């Protein structure tokens, strides 16, 4: 269906990681591409140039290993989520979201469930993704990170947009009283 096809264009990273505990890191990353490959080969006869499942699996594994390298976890490919720190689990979740090469990558408070010491490693990975061709939507309370990475900031209050603009406009010169009150709690 069209909805199913559209889902492949979005990568989602949640605050609680949502990794499958029974799967290794590499299998968590490869799961969605395996399902997509199976369906695409059935419909079109190929997946990323591969004409059969065996060749598709090689491509998917190479991609997953490359993504693990990108997030700094190459050595953890055969580990299980329970053996990873929260920051490592979140980086695996990011690699998993990237595995289908989405057009839009959505992050829901990607650091809120992490110890403060682990926040930096996850933010650095997200920061490195800014140069990719994907659009990123990041829900965050990490004001300095938002200032550094965002092209546009939307401040929401009570489920509606209170203010939007460049980081300079919204963070340094907020016009809305709700935005001003929120930002006054941070040293920026």
Language model features with spans:
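Conserved signature/switch motifs of ABC ATPase nucleotide-binding domains
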Residues: 79, 100, 132
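Conserved ABC ATPase signature
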Residues: 80-84, 88
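ABC ATPase NBD coupling module
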Residues: 1-11, 53-58, 131, 170-174
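Catalytic Walker B motif of ABC-type/P-loop ATPase nucleotide-binding domains
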Residues: 105-108
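ABC ATPase "signature
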Residues: 164-165
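A short, surface-exposed alpha-helical micro-motif characterized by mixed small hydrophobic
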Residues: 146-148
């Amino acid at each position: 269906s069209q909805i199913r096809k559209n889902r492949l264009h979005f990568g989602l990273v949640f605050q609680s990681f949502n990794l499958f505990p029974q799967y290794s890191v590499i299998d968590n990353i490869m799961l969605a591409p395996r399902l997509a490959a199976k369906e695409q080969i059935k419909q079109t006869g190929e997946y990323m140039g591969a004409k059969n499942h065996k060749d598709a699996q090689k491509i998917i594994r190479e991609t997953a290993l490359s993504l693990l390298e990108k997030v700094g976890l190459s050595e953890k490919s055969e580990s299980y989520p329970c053996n990873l720190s929260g920051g490592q689990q979140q980086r695996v979740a990011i690699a998993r979201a990237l595995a289908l090469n989405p057009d839009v990558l959505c992050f829901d408070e990607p650091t809120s469930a992490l110890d403060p010491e682990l926040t930096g490693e996850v933010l650095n990975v997200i920061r490195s993704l800014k140069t990719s061709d994907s659009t990123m939507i990041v829900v965050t309370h990490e004001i300095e990170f938002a200032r550094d990475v965002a092209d546009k900031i939307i401040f929401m209050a009570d489920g509606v947009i209170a203010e939007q603009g460049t980081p300079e406009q919204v963070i340094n010169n907020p016009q809305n009283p709700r935005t001003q009150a929120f930002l006054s709690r941070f040293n920026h």
